[in-house]
């Protein structure tokens, strides 16, 4: 796909019409910097504003029990609003009068992707806290070096291209007042990528559920139902990341029927969880032992049930290391990925502890090995625990507590 900006083609430019219209309210964003805001009101959002997931979800659940503050979830998903309210949580539809009022009067914006999941245009003058959504393996934001990537154009070029990207997607270039990280190493990457000066190593709120699986059980009924439906002897989770250049028609080199036969033989369920920005069809066949989870679903409560994680370049494995379970890496397109999509902070083989496969035959053989001797997949040139500690300073369920204290002490 030529002349693209993070996978955006001319045929899809119509979807940016709302962005162009939103520029008309730019003066409102500027004026809101002068408006007083309530420090007790903290508003939360996640991803693209449709889901209840990731770091924002777990910090919100923690903060909702704090009487010192008022915590509100803002979303474009009306069904989610109803669901959260049924659980006794405060939630509002993004474009409702109440949500707009909260967006312009609340002091604290907490998000794990961009301010737009709440409302970028009402965030002027707010205290912005970015929880982000992963310890990076691939380069992100200011550190992206692929020259046709929107972040590269918006950060490292001049002229019309830079102006266009920053005007159409201003939320991509917001510098948060605070950020959190999982280790000193990750903190350094975030400082470089986002330009945020106040970053605390608190750990990720979403990782609390890895250490304490029953935490917030009252609010995780949907996820618990998925866990209870996994009745096979073993469970494997396949969670690849997205591609900047091929989000819609990427072919995954997996022979699904052959894989399904192996899974059936070993009484194993194979879960597929694509990245929220991945629109490719991972599989088309209907297979008895393979299930595809919704892109926006929260997989962290499932980690307690998962016996093996398979990924390519997703940083999810840094979190999964906290389970002490094996990871299988399947970087089948690594050369193309490094040249066309993203470069990486470290050499891939230097931070990926576990076995690797580069084609389906190798992939199949690694799974056969896993079924015979599961822990063998943890054996590699890299020490599993060394990488685990390098990317996770804390190994407890207090990340939300530390994050809350960090935010409160900086207001």
Which residues fall in each region the model found?
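A donor-sugar binding/catalytic signature common to diverse glycosyltransferases
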Residues: 109-132, 136-139, 297-341
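Extended catalytic core of nucleotide-activated donor transferases of GT-like folds
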Residues: 57, 85-151
């Amino acid at each position: 796909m030529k002349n693209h900006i993070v996978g955006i083609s001319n045929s899809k430019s119509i979807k940016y019409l709302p962005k162009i219209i939103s520029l008309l309210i730019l003066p409102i964003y500027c004026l809101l910097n002068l408006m007083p805001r309530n420090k007790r009101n903290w508003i939360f959002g996640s991803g693209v504003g449709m889901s209840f997931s990731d770091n924002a979800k777990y910090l919100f659940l923690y903060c909702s029990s704090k009487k010192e503050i008022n915590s509100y979830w803002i979303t474009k998903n009306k069904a989610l609003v109803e669901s959260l309210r049924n659980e006794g949580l405060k939630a509002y539809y993004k474009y409702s009068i109440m949500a707009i009022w909260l967006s312009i009067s609340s002091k604290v914006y907490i998000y794990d992707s961009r301010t737009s999941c709440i409302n970028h245009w009402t965030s002027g003058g707010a205290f912005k806290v970015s929880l982000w959504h992963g310890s990076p393996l691939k380069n992100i934001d200011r550190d992206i070096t692929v020259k046709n990537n929107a972040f590269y154009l918006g950060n490292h070029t001049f002229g019309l291209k830079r102006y266009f990207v920053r005007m159409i997607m201003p939320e991509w270039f917001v510098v948060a007042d605070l950020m959190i990280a999982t280790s000193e190493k990750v903190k350094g990457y975030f400082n470089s990528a986002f330009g945020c000066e106040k970053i605390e190593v608190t750990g990720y709120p979403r990782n609390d559920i890895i250490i304490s699986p029953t935490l917030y059980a009252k609010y995780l009924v949907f996820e618990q139902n998925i866990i209870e439906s996994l009745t096979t002897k073993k469970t494997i989770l396949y969670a690849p990341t997205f591609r900047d250049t091929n989000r819609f028609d990427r072919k995954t080199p997996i022979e699904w029927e052959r894989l399904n036969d192996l899974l059936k033989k070993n009484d194993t369920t194979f879960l597929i969880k694509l990245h929220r920005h991945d629109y490719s069809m991972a599989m088309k066949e209907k297979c008895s032992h393979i299930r595809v989870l919704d892109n926006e679903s929260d997989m962290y409560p499932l980690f307690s049930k998962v016996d093996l994680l398979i990924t390519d370049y997703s940083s999810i494995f840094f979190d999964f290391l906290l389970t002490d379970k094996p990871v299988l890496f399947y970087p089948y397109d690594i050369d193309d990925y490094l040249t066309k999509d993203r470069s990486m902070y470290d050499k891939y083989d230097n931070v990926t502890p576990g076995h690797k496969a580069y084609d389906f035959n190798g992939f199949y053989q690694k799974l056969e090995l896993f079924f015979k001797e599961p822990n063998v997949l943890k054996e590699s040139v890299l020490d599993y625990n060394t990488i685990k500690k390098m990317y996770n300073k804390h190994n407890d369920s207090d990340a939300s507590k530390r994050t809350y204290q960090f935010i409160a002490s900086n207001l």
